[in-house]
From Swiss-Prot:
Pfam families assigned: Myosin_head, Myosin_N, Myosin_tail_1
Residue span of region Actin-binding: 667-689, 770-784
Domain Myosin motor, chain residue ranges per copy: 86-791
Encoding gene per record: myo-3
Record protein name field: Myosin-3
Keyword Coiled coil among UniProt keywords: yes
A GO biological process held by the record: sarcomere organization
Residue span(s) of domain IQ: 794-823
Organism whose genome encodes this protein: Caenorhabditis briggsae
Residues that, per the record, bind ATP: G179, E180, S181, G182, A183, G184, K185, T186
Domain named Myosin N-terminal SH3-like: residues: 33-82
GO cellular component: A band; cytoplasm; myosin filament; myosin II complex
Keywords: Actin-binding, ATP-binding, Coiled coil, Cytoplasm, Methylation, Motor protein, Muscle protein, Myosin, Nucleotide-binding, Thick filament
Assembly behavior: Muscle myosin is a hexameric protein that consists of 2 heavy chain subunits (MHC), 2 alkali light chain subunits (MLC) and 2 regulatory light chain subunits (MLC-2).
Annotated domain remarks: The rodlike tail sequence is highly repetitive, showing cycles of a 28-residue repeat pattern composed of 4 heptapeptides, characteristic for alpha-helical coiled coils.
Length: 1969
């Protein structure tokens, strides 16, 4: 940086761009020994600096900077550059060029965040991962128009060089910003575009014209605002980059011939369409989706029908939803603002949003497969309706187009059914196509806006930003194309830097040895794009029938594996890597590619039927525009029928335009464009993978430097000649360096002469330049040296020219004064003579006669002069006309010359190309001639063979013709066979499907037939057996009559119980489902938790046994806190005494100040002072000096007191640290005890292994829960990251509370670990319960209870997690407040010299905070103790559950014993955590109180700052006054001049005051958002302004009235004032240092205030979230109410059913009276049936047999028997259903509904059959009654089970009600918090209004004072004018006196004969006449 301007070093961005002079000097002074200092390899840092100690052979012993002594080989050591090259700005200047030096230089610069470094001809930039102040407008102005060597490395320097090259060379430029993904390409692109926009606008402004954009803003604003639009729709989050450009863009900024901005355009490449529908883990979809959902526009989501949360929409919620550090709401606002500036219409913007929302709705469209059909159908139409509404099409037609698209079969169009997979692909493909075409439309729309047609476009500068090289765990089709494009760009760089450069040297005839840098990438490029390459084979596979991704991968392996060095077989995946099918060796590394979906992505098929709908969209014009150029197959067919030439093209050939073809064409166009421009390269580097600022991963950076060719670029830049100029250009620019040599007309000879002259002068050497055929070549930096020489000569010439002009002007002024002097002397002499002769009579006569003698002559002379003037004017006009004609001719000739020059240059370039081609042709000719000789010899041999072959040919030709015919026939046959094969395959598939369906039908029929045959056989056997039992039926009837009454009662009870059960089952179903899911999840987690248990169980036991010790320790800490509070009280008293002393000193100072002002007034009022008065003044000044010394001593004492306070505080912190160590020891003891518990758990684990094996089949169904578990795991990871953030924030707590907070955090971590342990243990117990559910109904009921408890625990755990998060937020806020307290304490310490009364208030506020934090800690520990009570309650509940389990089985009791031990501890900690959650509310209230106190402390410190500022201004004013008075005394008696100086001084002071007022007003406007301290600033500024203006007004009056007397009196006190001046200067310096400290503290306060504002915003977000939760709870309550109403309806239905059953009972009663005779026998039969009830299945079979026998014997009672059989079957089904409900609770409600319907049908049938039975035999009725009685007994058993379950359901309901009440209580508390925040906001707004009024009052006061001052200033100006008039009069009077004394009156007639005297005489004569 040879010419860095001094002004730039003061810019805030300079430290991040270059080194200061002092830093360079310090670096250069570092000791260095070139023979000893070196670099050696290091595994961590790449290379490390070392010093050679000794050398032995080829071994070198070195000592590294780390202090390690290492022996390495000599060839491993690399040279180190001298210290003067430290942090060098251009690595091409390094003395030793090696990897170690380059890496070391980049690391040193990056450590200071100097991210830009030149590397020869290009610039290297390292991503800083933070915002730097190096892109501001001030930095742009510094770089604008500067040469590269004048400024430090910067992107702007390269941009300005490109701009100057474009303007000077009239050549298009390009800037290639390349690098890997995440290296910062997009950000640098935005900065480059902004720079060109500003430069172009500045050029336009310099030309007097500013180009306005078409609609929304200026053209430069529109160019800049394209970035937000493109980023919103084209950027997304990837694993390596939060704002990765997922498309490439080439932005061309056009300029006019004069460099004015003339518009721009954009071309895009490789948009990643697949991201719209799929995102990998850790990534996100395009930003626009999340911006729309951010809620920036409250009404927008409603218009777009996006009423659900973002997680509902599958297309954009597959991975990440937010980005750290990015506010989607703010980004949405910027995007909308960019749309407005770009001139987008509102309808256009809304269509974009609607289309985007339509894609989101398309992702939620559900389809399902029809049973036994290859046809998909819609599964719900809500999302389809929304999508169609957004796209402007009909929903029904849209769904039909997706499920049954129209296809062409022969010559007809039919609807083809699609299966589920095909429909899903069609939806995804259509969504991708819509988004891609929409993005293309946005590009075209931006180009339309940027097209400034009124300005002619001459040249452009293009900026290329394309996706960087990507190597992911899973690389697909998109990564292949991105990496291929980067491969082409790297090849372009290598070709431009290394090949073209050296070829041009050879063309120009320069002696040069070709260097092969080994960077040719052509092999990899040909592997991908050449015929039979990867892309070619892919396109071929896309048109091959039945081709798949696997066949494509296999073809690649067969074609290239082992045959091409860049193609490899992929290695097995490691870690998270996905499967791969092939690998390619790129320049940046080997990439493994997965070939899945390659063919589908390359073909990118679309559903033509759906596209046809979109082409006719109704109310979305965007759809019409983007699909306008798309031609469907139907449209192509119609066009072909109509005879249009392009009709069939779309349907056939264009369908094979694959994505690869389109990409390849656009890439070739891009490369052609780049080859036609002059490129500038920006290489972006990723410093590390962790996105950490200031950290360099040496291996990663070295790999990128090697791949990018950085070292090779530096080498060729140093060895070669990177700069060159044509001979005419060189002569034109540098002729001034050798004017004589440049006179030659031949540009080449003139240029050589100029260079010889420069070389002879010693400014250049022959090695620094070379003479070519058409150009001169220079080494790097030579042109800069020539520019410096040129500037130096121009400076000398301009200086000499200026001196000549000044000399001429001075001489002309001397001549003018000499002539003036001569004329004045003559006039004076004539006047004196006239005064003497005016009374002489002859002179009077002469005066009368003289005019008459010369009047005629004068008239003639005047006439001649008029004629001459007229002739001269005509001649002048003719000359002007001729000159204008000549100027026109000259301009035409200049234009012709320029045109000829350009054509000459073009011809020269063409000539050079022709010569190059000629040379290549000559070489080719020589090669061909050598080949020709070889071929001639071969030809002779071949002729001989030809004769032999000719004979054979004739014989073979006949055979060949026959074979050809045969082959043609075979081909024709083969084609026909192929067509028939395809049609038959289709028919076979359809027939196979039909056969499969028919086979299924046949199988079913056979099965039914067998079943019927078996039933018939059984019926025949049962009929025979039942004939013997008919006699016994009458006996059973009598027994049934007695049981009929019981039946009626049982039915009533059953109906009531069923209604209750139906009501409760809906409620229980949700809990059961959640419990089942939790059980499944816990089972899946079991294996993972087993290892965790081994580490965590010791903590559990330790926590239970050591809780009492921790509570005792907490009490001890509380006592110590109280002791610290007592110490603080003592310190408070000491501060009070210090404050009193400070107040006393201030009062003394104020009194002395007033005395000093009174003395000054007396001095000005009195004319002089006596010696006694002067002596008194000296004494007073001595007293003032003494008081100042005392004041300084007081300040020192105060600092001593503050230091003692700090020391005491440090001691207290040390004690707390010791206590923390004690806690850690206790924790270690607990770890030992936990090991014992682990052994017990292992024994229990062995017992459960057998049960685990039995549940393996059940675990298969748990696979569906894995996704949920992964989500929970993700949440756990997020919580872990939150804990890490919490730990990082906790480290910033002050020393007073840090240890206590860490203790609380450890306890929280233990609580969390115990909860996780509890959940694990609970899962084991639940698994044990589920194993015994099948053994006993009681155990099943108990398991259901346990599931409910587990559900409750899960809800409580979620509540605990939410409260833990809120607690973490609160803790972070407390840490921020504590950090702010520390800052204010620091300011308190540094501002001890000012206002101790405000410090007193700040100290009290700090003490209050400490007291409140102590109380908070006491509350925490007290609430921990209170958790014990809740623990006992839960233990009792668990004991009850345990007793139930013990009744079930002894084995269950064994497991329950261990469970109780674990659950006691877990539930204890759970309740403790719940209390901690409630405690958070109190902590939040404490936090608000702390915030209030902090604001008070800020106010006090702001007052201190204002007071210091006023003191500084007073001291500055006094010092200036002393200086002015001293200067006045030194100048003596020049009183008037002194008055003027005083006036000017007062004006300066007035300007300072005005400036201070303006600054205060600006500060008030800027700090309106910081309302908490604005009031103090405004009031202080207003009082200071009034005070200062009043003082100055008094000073003005006193000064104007008494300035003469003050000057005389101050002469005697000059020595005393001199001493006072020195003292004032010393105080001034001290105050200035204090002011700097206060300004730093003020910046801290501003940042703290901004953090507080962020906290307020966060609270507002919390309030909104709570409102959402309230709405969700209300919705749940409504659902419960609806369920209750539904249960009541079911109860009514069952009541009606009961009435029907009562009627049935009456009918049965009538049958009972008819069968009374056989009652005894029926009773016996009933006893037998009762014994059979124990086995439900056997009882059911027997009952069926009896019913069938009765049916065969008594045809009249068939109906009643069938009815009884159905009732028996129903009873069995009911029993089976109840058992099934215990295993599968989610199907329970469906069973109830089916049972209800079945009962209704059965009751109707039974009523009919009972009526028939009255007319039948009596024996049949007895049988029916017996069956009913059996069914009653079964129902009674079922009823008992249902009653037990009903009781459990009621318990769960009561628990749910308790949870609802808890939630309602939380909602009330959150509402209270919201009301408090609202009140706070209202107060802040009121204060803001007050502040604004105060500002307006201050402005009015300032304006009135300013008017007063202007009046005084006018009076002073009048006095100055009067003084000047008096001085002029006095000087004239003195001159008259001197003139009258020196002139002697003449005695005669001494008139001088001169023109002047003649003129005087003529005037005299005229007067005489």
């Amino acid at each position: 940086m040879s010419g860095n301007p001094d002004a730039f070093e003061n810019d805030p961005g300079f430290p991040f761009l270059g080194m200061s002079r002092e830093a360079k000097a310090a670096s250069a002074a570092r000791p260095f020994d070139s023979k000893k200092n070196c670099w050696i390899p290091d595994p961590e840092d790449g290379f490390v600096a070392a010093e050679i100690q000794s050398t032995t052979g080829d071994q070198v012993t070195v000592v590294t900077v780390k202090g390690n002594q290492i022996t390495v080989k000599k060839d491993q050591c690399q040279e180190m550059n001298p210290p003067k090259f430290d942090k060098t700005e251009d690595m091409a200047n390094l003395t030793f060029l090696n990897e170690a030096s380059v890496l070391g230089n980049l690391k040193d610069r990056y450590k200071d965040l100097m991210i830009y470094t030149y590397s020869g001809l290009f610039c290297v930039v390292i991503n800083p991962y933070k915002r730097l102040p190096i892109y501001s407008e001030s930095v742009i102005k510094h770089f604008m128009g500067k040469r590269r060597n004048e400024m430090p490395p910067h992107l702007f320097a390269v941009s300005d060089e490109a701009y100057r090259n474009m303007v000077q060379d009239k050549e298009n430029q390009s800037m290639l910003i390349t690098g890997e993904s995440g290296a910062g390409k997009t950000e640098n692109t935005k900065k480059v575009i902004s720079y060109f926009a500003i430069v172009g606008a500045t050029q336009a402004a310099a030309g007097g014209k500013k180009e306005e954009g078409k609609k929304g803003g200026t053209l430069e604003e529109q160019i800049v605002q394209t970035n937000p639009v493109l980023e919103a729709f084209g950027n997304a989050k990837t694993v390596r980059n939060n704002n990765s450009s997922r498309f490439g863009k080439f932005i061309r900024t056009h300029f006019s011939g004069s460099g004015k901005l003339a518009g721009g355009d954009i071309e895009h490449y490789l948009l990643e369409k697949s991201r719209v529908v799929r995102q990998a883990p850790g990534e996100r979809c395009y930003h626009i989706f999340y911006q729309i959902m951010s809620g920036n526009d409250a009404s927008l989501r409603g218009k777009l029908k996006l009423n659900n949360d973002i997680t509902y929409y599958h297309f954009c919620s597959q991975a990440e939803l937010t980005i750290e550090g990015m506010d989607d709401k703010e980004e949405m606002r910027l995007t909308q603002e960019a749309f407005d500036i770009m001139g987008f219409e509102d309808q256009e913007t809304m269509d974009l949003y609607r289309s985007t929302a339509g894609i989101m709705h398309m992702g939620e469209m559900k389809f399902k497969q029809r049973p036994r059909e290859e046809q998909a159908e819609p599964d719900g139409e809500e999302d389809a309706l929304n999508a169609a509404a957004m796209l402007g099409i009909n929903a029904e037609e849209f769904l039909k187009a997706l499920t049954k698209p129209r296809v062409r079969v022969g010559t007809e169009w039919v609807n083809k059914g699609q299966n589920l997979e095909q429909v899903s692909w069609a939806v995804s493909g259509l969504a991708k196509a819509i988004y891609a075409r929409m993005f293309k439309w946005i590009i075209n729309r931006c180009n339309k806006t940027l097209d400034a047609k009124e300005i002619e476009r001459k040249h452009f500068i293009g900026v290329l930003d394309i996706a960087g090289f990507e190597i992911f765990d899973l690389n697909s089709f998109e990564q292949l194309w991105i990496n291929f494009v980067n491969e082409r760009l790297q090849q372009f760089f290598n070709h431009h830097m290394f090949v073209l450069e050296q070829e041009e040297y050879k063309r120009e005839g320069i002696a040069w040895t070709f260097i092969d840098f080994g960077l040719d990438l052509q092999a990899c490029i040909e592997l991908i794009e050449k015929p039979l390459g990867i892309i070619s084979i892919l396109d071929e596979e896309c048109i091959v029938p039945k081709a798949t991704d696997m066949t494509y991968a296999q073809k690649l392996l067969d074609q290239h594996l082992g045959k091409h060095p860049n193609f490899q077989k992929p290695k097995p995946p490691k870690g998270k890597q996905g499967d791969a099918h092939f690998a390619i060796v790129h320049y940046a590394g080997t990439v493994r590619y997965n070939a899945n979906n390659f063919l589908e992505k390359n073909k990118d098929p679309l559903n033509d039927t759906a596209v046809a709908l979109l082409k006719h969209s109704v109310d979305n014009n965007l759809m019409l525009d983007i699909w306008q150029d798309y031609q469907t197959q139907e449209e192509a067919a119609e066009a072909a029928k109509a005879g249009q030439s392009g009709g069939g093209k779309r349907g056939k050939s264009s369908s094979f335009a694959t994505v690869s073809m389109i990409y390849r064409e656009s890439l070739n166009n891009l490369m052609n464009m780049l080859y036609q421009t002059h490129p500038h390269f920006i290489r972006c580097i990723i410093p590390n993978e962790k996105k950490a600022s200031g950290v360099i991963d040496s291996a990663l950076v070295l790999n990128q430097l090697t791949c990018n060719g950085v070292l090779e670029g530096i080498r060729i830049c140093r060895k070669g000649f990177p700069n060159r100029m044509l001979y005419p250009d060189f002569k034109h620019r540098y002729a001034i360096l050798a004017a004589d040599a440049a006179k030659d007309s031949d540009p080449k000879k003139a240029s050589v002469g100029i260079l010889d002259k420069i070389a002879n002068d010693g400014n250049l050497t022959d090695e620094e330049f070379k003479i070519g055929e058409t150009k001169i070549f220079f080494k790097a930096g030579v042109l800069a040296k020539l520019e410096d020489l040129r500037d130096e000569i121009l400076s000398r010439i301009v200086t000499m020219f200026q001196s000549r002009i000044r000399s001429y002007l001075a001489k002309a002024e001397v001549r003018r004064r000499y002539e003036q002097q001569t004329g004045l002397l003559i006039v004076q002499r004539n006047v004196r003579a006239w005064c003497t002769l005016r009374t002489w009579e002859w002179f009077k006569l002469f005066g009368k006669v003289k005019p008459m003698l010369k009047a005629g002559k004068e008239q003639e002379a005047m006439g001649e002069l008029a004629e001459k003037i007229q002739k001269l004017e005509e001649a002048v006009q003719r000359g002007e006309i001729a000159r204008s004609q000549l100027e026109t001719q000259v301009a035409d000739l200049v234009e012709e010359k320029n045109a000829l020059f350009l054509s000459l240059e073009t011809e020269k370039a063409n000539l050079a190309d022709a010569e190059e081609r000629n040379e290549k042709l000559n070489q080719l000719k020589a090669t061909l001639e050598s080949k020709l000789t070889d071929i001639t010899g071969q030809l002779e041999d071949m002729q001989e063979r030809h004769e032999d072959l000719t004979r054979q040919k004739k014989k073979t030709e006949q055979e060949l013709s026959d074979t050809k015919k045969h082959v043609q026939d075979l081909e024709l046959t083969l084609r026909k066979a192929e067509q028939e094969k395809q049609s038959r395959d289709h028919q076979i598939r359809s027939l196979q499907d039909e056969m499969a369906n028919q086979d299924e039908s046949v199988a079913k029929l056979n099965k039914e037939k067998k079943h019927q045959e078996e039933s018939n056989r059984k019926l025949n056997e049962d009929l025979q057996s039942e004939e013997d039992k008919v006699n016994h039926l009458e006996k059973i009837r009598n027994k049934l009559e007695q049981q009929m009454d019981e039946l009626e009662e049982t039915i009533d009870r059953e109906k009531r119980s069923r209604s209750d059960i139906e009501k409760s089952k809906r409620k229980v179903e949700g809990d059961l489902k959640v419990a089942q899911e939790n059980i499944d999840e816990i089972t899946k987690q079991k294996q993972d938790v087993e290892n965790t248990l081994k580490r965590k169980e010791d903590d559990l036991h330790h926590a239970s046994t050591k809780l009492a010790e921790e509570q005792a320790l907490a009490a001890k800490l509380q006592r110590q806190i109280k002791e610290l509070q007592a110490r603080i009280a003592e310190l408070e008293e000491e501060l009070e005494s210090e404050r009193n002393s400070r107040q006393k000193a201030d009062r003394t100072r104020n009194e002395l100040q007033r005395e000093l002002e009174e003395i000054s007034e007396r001095l000005e009022q009195q004319g002089g002072f006596s010696a006694a008065q002067l002596e008194a003044n000296k004494k007073r000044e001595a007293e003032i000096a003494k008081l100042r010394r005392e004041k300084e001593e007081d300040a020192l004492n105060h600092e001593t007191a503050v230091s003692s306070l700090r020391k005491r505080q440090v001691d207290a912190v040390a004690e707390l640290t010791e206590q923390l160590e004690t806690l850690q020891k206790l924790k270690a003891k607990g770890d030992a005890e936990r090991a014992k518990l682990q052994r017990d758990l292992e024994e229990a684990q062995h017992a459960t292994d057998s049960e685990v094996r039995a549940r393996q089949e059940v675990e298969k169904s748990y696979k569906t829960i894995e996704v949920q578990f992964s989500e929970l795991q993700t949440k756990a990871d997020e919580q872990s990251r939150q804990l890490q953030d919490f730990a990082a924030l906790k480290n910033r707590l002050n020393n007073e509370n840090g240890d206590l907070n860490r203790t609380l955090e450890e306890m929280d971590n233990q609580v969390n670990s115990l909860h996780r342990l509890k959940s694990t243990l609970q899962s084991q117990l639940d698994e044990t319960r589920r194993n015994f559910e099948e053994e006993s109904r009681e155990r099943q009921a108990l398991a259901a209870t346990a599931k409910n408890l587990e559900h409750e625990n899960e809800i409580l755990r979620e509540h605990l997690d939410e409260e833990a998060e809120s607690k973490a937020d609160l803790t972070r806020q407390i840490s921020k407040l504590n950090a702010e307290i520390q800052q204010w304490k620091a300011r308190f310490d540094s501002e001890g010299l000012n206002k101790l009364e405000e410090i007193e208030a700040a100290k009290k506020a700090l003490q209050l905070k400490v007291q409140e934090l102590s109380d908070t800690n006491e509350g925490l520990f007290a609430k921990i103790a209170s958790q014990e009570k809740v623990r006992h309650k839960l233990m009792q509940d668990l004991d009850d559950a345990q007793s139930d389990v013990e009744k079930a089985a002894a084995q269950v009791a064994y497991y329950e014993k261990h469970r109780r031990q674990f659950e006691k501890i877990v539930e204890e900690w759970k309740k403790k955590t719940d209390d901690l959650a409630s405690e958070l509310d109190a902590a939040q209230r404490d936090n608000r109180q702390l915030s209030t106190d902090l604001f008070k402390a800020k106010t006090a410190n702001d007052e201190l700052a204002e007071y210091l500022d006023s003191t500084r201004r007073e001291n500055k004013s006094l010092a200036q006054e002393v200086k002015d008075l001293t200067d006045q005394l030194g100048e003596g008696g020049r009183s008037v001049a002194e008055l003027q100086k005083i006036v000017r001084r007062l004006e300066v002071e007035k300007e300072e005051l005005q400036k201070a007022l303006d600054e205060a007003e600006a500060a008030l406007e800027a700090e309106e958002a910081k309302v908490l301290r604005a009031q103090i600033e405004v009031s202080q500024i207003r009082s200071e302004i009034e005070k200062r203006i009043q003082e100055k007004e008094e000073e003005f009056e006193n000064t104007r009235r008494n300035h003469q007397r003050a000057l005389e009196s101050m002469q005697a006190t000059l020595e005393a004032e001199t001493k006072q001046k020195e003292e004032a200067l010393r105080i001034k310096k001290k105050l200035e240092s204090d002011i700097n400290d206060l300004e730093i503290a003020l910046d801290h306060a501003n940042r703290a205030n901004a953090d507080a504002q962020k906290t307020i915003k966060k609270y507002m977000e919390t309030v909104r979230e709570l409102q959402v939760q309230i709405e969700e709870e209300q919705r749940q309550k409504d659902e419960l109410r609806e369920q209750f109403l539904a249960s009541e309806k079911r109860n009514g239905i069952l009541q009606a059913e009961k009435d029907e059953l009562a009627q049935q009972a009456e009918a049965a009663e009538r049958a009972r009276r008819n069968a009374e005779a056989d009652c005894i026998e029926l009773r016996e039969q009933n006893n037998d049936l009762s014994n059979q009830v124990s086995s439900l299945t056997g009882w059911r079979r027997k009952l069926e047999g009896e019913l069938l026998a009765v049916h065969a014997e008594l045809e009249e009672l068939v109906t009643e028997l069938k009815n009884a059989q159905e009732q028996g079957q129903k009873a069995s089904a009911d029993a089976a259903r109840l058992a099934e409900e215990l295993r599968q609770e989610q199907e329970h409600s469906m069973h109830i509904e089916r049972i209800r319907k079945g009962l209704e049908l059965q009751i109707k049938e039974m009523q009919i059959r009972l009526d028939d039975a009255e007319n039948a035999a009596l024996k049949g009725g007895k049988k029916i009654i017996a069956q009913l009685e059996a069914r009653i007994r079964a129902i009674e058993q079922e009823l008992d089970g249902e009653q037990r379950r009903h009781q459990d359901t009621e318990k769960n309901w009561r628990k749910a009600e308790r949870r609802v009440k808890e939630v309602e209580f939380q909602v009330i508390e959150e509402k209270k918090n919201e009301e408090r925040l609202t009140e706070l906001v209202d107060k802040l707004q009121t204060k803001l209004k007050i502040f604004k009024r105060q500002v307006e009052e201050a402005e009015e006061v300032a304006a009135s004072n300013l008017n007063k001052y202007k009046v005084l200033q006018a009076q002073f100006e009048q006095a100055d004018e009067r003084a000047e008039i008096a001085e002029n009069a006095l000087s004239k009077m003195r001159n008259k006196i001197r003139a009258s004394a020196s002139v002697i009156p003449p005695d005669g007639f001494p008139l001088a004969q001169s023109p002047s005297s003649a003129l005087v005489r003529s005037a005299s004569n005229a007067r005489f006449l």
